[in-house]
Amino acid sequence: MTKVIEALSDWQSIRKTINDLSVGFVPTMGNLHAGHLSLLERSKCENTITVLSLFINPTQFNDKNDFKNYPRTLAQDIAMAEENGIDYVLAPTDDALYPDQYAYKITNSTINNQEAEFRPRHFDGVLTVVMKLLLLVKPTRAYFGEKDYQQLQLVKGLAEAFFLDTEIIGCKIVRNEFGLPLSSRNRRLTEDQYQLAQRFSEIFHSDLSCDEIKNALIQEGIIVDYIEDYNERRFAAVHVGDIRLIDNIPFAKDKKC
């Protein structure tokens, strides 16, 4: 039976009772979809206990409207956790996770490209909340999707830099039948925007160069933040209407931009 925990002190008491068990952790901002469920299933396969967190982290939003419009589906998410046999759901409040009012934060002073360039202070918020959650949950393994690939690499670096006793595991992107990565933001797309998002996916996954992809997307009416190759992966961030979408794929060495 799934146990839902809001008070961090309650979780800390529970955590002491499962010290001898392997614990898998999937941190999310809720609005769960099949991509999240794939992370949870892997955790269940590899650990005795699985913990899911549902917390819309205010410090990682550089756009107040984006934070305001982020889907809030707590009851639905808890029901999905119960249906999928998740042991614990951690659903803290802002004040509980940020008793310091964000006076203390984790930052990476070397990252300045891709998401770091277009979303100022975003990764400060991400790394800070991930550090807090990892210290609270003390998981054996924590699972992150490769859709947010830059975030995944930073979290791995965080765990290594601070000697955290948690294995950070990246999991493959779950896509729809058109190749579009599953994302909570997709649910905010209108029917016309969804068609355009599919075109973004089709063009991005083509054999075109970065510049050719960018030009093709612009011709479709899609606003492009970046299309670039880095460390043998191709990355994209675009706007379809007021919805920002990201994606990344590995690429052959002879197909760099």
From Swiss-Prot:
Location in the cell: Cytoplasm
GO BP annotation list: pantothenate biosynthetic process
GO cellular component: cytosol
Keywords: ATP-binding, Cytoplasm, Ligase, Nucleotide-binding, Pantothenate biosynthesis
Active site: H36 (proton donor)
EC number: 6.3.2.1
Binding-site list for ATP: 29-36, 145-148, 174, 182-185
The protein's name in its UniProt record: Pantothenate synthetase
Gene (UniProt): panC
